[in-house]
Amino acid sequence: MAADPIHQFQITKLFTLGHVGGQEIAFTNSSAYMFGTVALIAILMLVPGRQLVPGRLQSIAELSYEFVANMIRSTAGKEGLKFFPLVFSLFMFIAVSNLIGIVPYTFTVSSHLIVTVALALLVFFTVLIYGFSKNGLKFFKLFVPSGVPIYILPLVVFIEVISFFLKPVSHSVRLFANMLAGHIALKVFASFVAMLGALGVVGWFGAVLPLGLTIALTALELLVAFLQAYVFAILTCIYLNDAIHPGH
C-alpha cells in the first residue's frame, strides 16, 4: 500500500514544556524544524565572518543581503530599508524552511496554514501600526484612490477596505497552498516508483516515467522554494510601501 501523502504534514509532540491555564504547551516536530531553520540561517550569516576574499558561504550571505536590499529599494524606496531586518528574516526563514522540506523524511514548516497566517499577520499589523504612527489619519488616504469620480467613490473605498483586510488571507494561503500541493504531488509520484519497483523487472520499466516525473518535480520544487519566499517578501515590501506612502 502506498504511503499516505498527507502523513508528511502531521504535527507530532516531542515533549511537554508545561501547562498554562490547563492547556498543555508541547514542543513539536514543527517547533524543532523552526529552531533548526533559524540555526541554519545563523550559521550561514555568522560563521563565514567578514573576509576580504569571501568564501562560498560568505558569498551566499552577501548575495542574499543585496538581493533583499535591492528588492526593498525598488518597491518601497530608501525609506523602506528601515524594514530590512523584517523582510530579510521573512525571506530567509521561508526559503530555508522550504528547502529543508524538500529533503526526504523532513518536515515542511510552511505547509501549515497556522505558520503562514502568523507570518502574514506579522506583516499586516506592522503595516497598520507603522502606517498610523507615521501618517496618523492620513493613512486612510490609502483607501481613497486619486482621480476616482465622486459618484463611484463610496464603492471604490468599500472595495479598497475589503481588499486591504483580505491581504493577510491571500498572503498566507498562497504560500501554504503552493507548498502543500507541491509536496503532495511529489509524494504521490515517488510512491508510484516504489510500488512499481516492488513488482520486479516488469515494474522497473513502468517505474521509469514516474521516476522521471519525480526528478522533474523535485527540480520544480527547488525553484518554487525560492520563488515562494521571493513572492512573500516582495508582497511584504509592497504592503510596507502602502504604510510609508499611503497616497495613491
From Swiss-Prot:
Keywords: ATP synthesis, Cell inner membrane, Cell membrane, CF(0), Hydrogen ion transport, Ion transport, Membrane, Transmembrane, Transmembrane helix, Transport. Its main location: membrane. InterPro entries: ATP_synth_F0_asu, ATP_synth_F0_asu_AS, ATP_synth_F0_asu_bact/mt, F0_ATP_A_sf. It is a multi-pass membrane protein. It comes from the Bacteria. The chain crosses the membrane at residues 27-47, 83-103, 113-133, 142-162, 192-212, 215-235. The keyword Membrane applies. GO terms for cellular component: plasma membrane; proton-transporting ATP synthase complex. The keyword Cell inner membrane applies. It is found in: Cell inner membrane. One of its GO terms (molecular function) is proton-transporting ATP synthase activity, rotational mechanism. Signal peptide: none annotated. Belongs to the ATPase A chain family. F-type ATPases have 2 components, CF(1) - the catalytic core - and CF(0) - the membrane proton channel. CF(1) has five subunits: alpha(3), beta(3), gamma(1), delta(1), epsilon(1). CF(0) has four main subunits: a, b, b' and c. Key component of the proton channel; it plays a direct role in the translocation of protons across the membrane. This is ATP synthase subunit a. The gene is atpB.
